[in-house]
């Protein structure tokens, strides 16, 4: 690992101590005394510094975060996938001092004991509505809004707009009722998160390495008679055994289900010659993958091979263009129009010829698509990490090719970190 100086990286400037001619590391999971791996204090310090920088360049006085990815980014705390859709945890960060964290019941006590980087006086238990299960009339939203207003006054930023990423409507109304001006805080947090430190890049590389291994297991097991749901179960087992902390979703799509892409899995049984594609969405220490691969069952047809070749060409031309200073509209223009591969318009084809940032969230900046990039181009910068994905249905209707590569933007191009073989259509258990 490089000896990064967070002060050099707050604005997204990669440390001059990093030698990009070296491979990006994918070390083991254990902490060891004989080599440097992830420096978690440095990681947390970088993320707080980036958030402070993003706040300073915004018009906000503070951000109030209910999005678990933002909470983890600011506080270095997590209580698992269970909380992702509950909107029950929240954090407040003014940029003038350390963050406040309200966590679910006893988790607050746990953080005071086991998370020494957090100020124990700022680790509080909190509860709101649990997506409406607790009615507004219970008074928890009002109580929380009043407490937040008092803290903002103490920090000297109560007269400035408060950025909020996501929240339940009663919480929004309660914040407005105490006189706070509410604005979109998600954009500020995305500003902070779009440039990764080398610790984050190594974690993303390790996350991809876990999926490399899962695809090896998929390839060995992909045979006639096995079902899509069985492959999802196998991949989930392999991922958790390898250190994944959250298998968010695995798409397993095959045969006639490939076109149009349904974005799910079923109990369909694989048959000889099927084209099958998978998307593995999981995280290692919070850092996610979005990693498609297409494999055929035993054999392939000329139409399937042609579909794969075209999808590969589309992704390769995009990868070749990735470098600092490039804009997303130029990459999107290299991809086919929706009508060229069977869709009525770009909205229906959204997500098929696609690029998106990956980090603590599955979709970060930049977003690359013919739907949005022409009207709102975005400049690519060193230190961004994003996925590029393409899709092409087979001309005979028997399958479709789906490929995705994650790339790290370097000073003179990019580095691919998704390494399971994909230059040619992979035939599993050829016969």
Where are these regions (language model features)?
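Active-site neighborhoods and metal-handling regions in enzymes and metal-associated proteins
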Residues: 1-431
């Amino acid at each position: 690992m490089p000896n990064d100086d967070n002060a050099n990286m707050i604005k997204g400037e990669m440390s001059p101590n990093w030698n990009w001619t070296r491979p990006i590391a994918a070390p083991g999971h254990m902490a060891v005394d004989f080599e440097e791996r992830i420096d978690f204090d440095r990681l947390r310090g970088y993320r707080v510094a980036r958030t402070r920088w993003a706040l300073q360049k915004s018009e906000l006085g503070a951000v109030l975060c209910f999005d678990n990815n933002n909470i983890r980014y600011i506080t270095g705390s997590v209580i698992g996938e269970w909380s992702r859709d509950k909107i029950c945890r929240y954090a407040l960060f003014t940029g003038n001092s350390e963050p406040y964290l309200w966590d679910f019941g006893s988790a607050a006590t746990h953080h005071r004991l086991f998370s020494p980087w957090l100020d124990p006086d700022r680790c509080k238990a909190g509860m709101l509505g649990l997506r409406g299960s607790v009615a507004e009339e219970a008074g928890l939203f009002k109580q929380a809004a009043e407490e937040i207003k008092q803290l903002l006054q103490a920090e000297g930023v109560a007269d400035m707009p408060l950025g909020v990423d996501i929240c339940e409507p009663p919480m929004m109304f309660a914040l407005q009722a105490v006189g706070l001006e509410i604005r979109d805080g998600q954009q500020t947090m995305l500003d902070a998160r779009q440039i990764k430190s080398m610790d984050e890049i190594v974690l993303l590389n390790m996350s991809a390495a876990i999926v490399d291994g899962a695809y090896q297991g998929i390839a060995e097991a992909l045979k006639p008679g096995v079902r899509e749901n069985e492959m999802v179960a196998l991949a989930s087992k392999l991922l958790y055994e390898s250190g994944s902390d959250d298998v968010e979703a695995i798409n397993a799509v095959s045969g006639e289900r490939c076109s149009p892409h349904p974005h799910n899995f079923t109990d369909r049984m694989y048959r000889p010659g099927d084209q099958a594609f998978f998307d593995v969405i999981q995280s290692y220490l919070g850092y996610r993958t979005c990693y498609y691969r297409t494999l055929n069952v035993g054999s392939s047809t000329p139409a399937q091979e042609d579909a794969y070749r075209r999808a590969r060409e589309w992704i390769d031309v995009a990868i070749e263009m990735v470098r600092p200073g490039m804009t997303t509209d130029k990459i999107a223009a290299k991809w086919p129009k929706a009508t060229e591969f069977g869709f009525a318009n770009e909205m229906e084809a959204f997500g098929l010829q696609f690029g998106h940032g990956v980090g603590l969230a599955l979709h970060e900046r930049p977003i690359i698509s013919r739907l949005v990039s022409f009207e709102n181009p975005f400049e690519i910068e060193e230190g961004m990490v994003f996925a590029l994905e393409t899709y092409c249905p087979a001309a005979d209707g028997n399958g479709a090719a789906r490929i995705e590569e994650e790339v790290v933007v370097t000073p003179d191009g990019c580095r691919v970190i998704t390494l399971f073989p994909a230059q040619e259509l992979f035939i599993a258990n050829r016969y």
